[in-house]
Amino acid sequence: MSTDILRKIEAYKREEIAAAKARLALDELKARTRDQSAPHGFLKALEAKRAAGQFALIAEIKKASPSKGLIRPDFDPPALAKAYEEGGAACLSVLTDTPSFQGAPEFLTAARQACSLPALRKDFLFDPYQVYEARSWGADCILIIMASVDDDLAKELEDTAFALGMDALIEVHDEAEMERALKLSSRLLGVNNRNLRSFEVNLAVSERLAKMAPSDRLLVGESGIFTHEDCLRLEKSGIGTFLIGESLMRQHDVAAATRALLTGAEKL
């Protein structure tokens, strides 16, 4: 996404945040987070898969995208969550942004309740209020996109997540963002293989940036991962955890496609 697109997203997000705060005061929202059961360990679930010698998949529930339009017409978040779990995914990622991705908070809540997998709120975050929202909807992890926030806001979002017992996935797409991300505490780093300005996707981005990450960080390959062979390629660079959405969302049998992607049992 270009800088201009990110600015437009931030503009409508800040309008959404203001409207949400007008509807529900922060203190009341915080009370709702206390009604939730404790977060399931998102990072812990990924590390458990890797420790068992398996690829760790964050499987994404995504109805549409700005670049591809409608991805899955028969969109059923609980059924998709169960299919991903059956196929061997470690965690879920659920789009909650409506204007760009046709996502919704209720998709996250429904998917999270349908299975035992920890869930990420996949959205553009610009205010700690949104972290409390995520927790109140049942999310176990948030996404912090370094391209869209400054260092102070990134730390504020991360601190809020940690205070709520959540994990934070820090997303980067170039060396400068990786350097900034490494100043944060989270061990969960996502490398987006999509150039946010040209939309070009290249797995070499993950391969290049992986060299910058200390061994205590868990790297997640994002975008452009379609086959088991793609997973094997990134594993050579030390990346065995992946966030994958579109390629699985387009499959008729999501559970079988997930299993094939992770194990190479059959071609997708």
Curated annotation (Swiss-Prot):
<dbReference type="GO" id="GO:0004640">
    <property type="term" value="F:phosphoribosylanthranilate isomerase activity"/>
</dbReference>
<dbReference type="InterPro" id="IPR045186">
    <property type="entry name" value="Indole-3-glycerol_P_synth"/>
</dbReference>
<keyword id="KW-0057">Aromatic amino acid biosynthesis</keyword>
<dbReference type="InterPro" id="IPR013785">
    <property type="entry name" value="Aldolase_TIM"/>
</dbReference>
<dbReference type="InterPro" id="IPR001468">
    <property type="entry name" value="Indole-3-GlycerolPSynthase_CS"/>
</dbReference>
<dbReference type="GO" id="GO:0004425">
    <property type="term" value="F:indole-3-glycerol-phosphate synthase activity"/>
</dbReference>
<comment type="similarity">
    <text>Belongs to the TrpC family.</text>
</comment>
<dbReference type="InterPro" id="IPR011060">
    <property type="entry name" value="RibuloseP-bd_barrel"/>
</dbReference>
<keyword id="KW-0028">Amino-acid biosynthesis</keyword>
<keyword id="KW-0822">Tryptophan biosynthesis</keyword>
<dbReference type="GO" id="GO:0000162">
    <property type="term" value="P:L-tryptophan biosynthetic process"/>
</dbReference>
<protein>
    <recommendedName>
        <fullName>Indole-3-glycerol phosphate synthase</fullName>
        <ecNumber>4.1.1.48</ecNumber>
    </recommendedName>
</protein>
<comment type="pathway">
    <text>Amino-acid biosynthesis; L-tryptophan biosynthesis; L-tryptophan from chorismate: step 4/5.</text>
</comment>
<dbReference type="InterPro" id="IPR013798">
    <property type="entry name" value="Indole-3-glycerol_P_synth_dom"/>
</dbReference>
<dbReference type="Pfam" id="PF00218">
    <property type="entry name" value="IGPS"/>
</dbReference>
<keyword id="KW-0456">Lyase</keyword>
<keyword id="KW-0210">Decarboxylase</keyword>
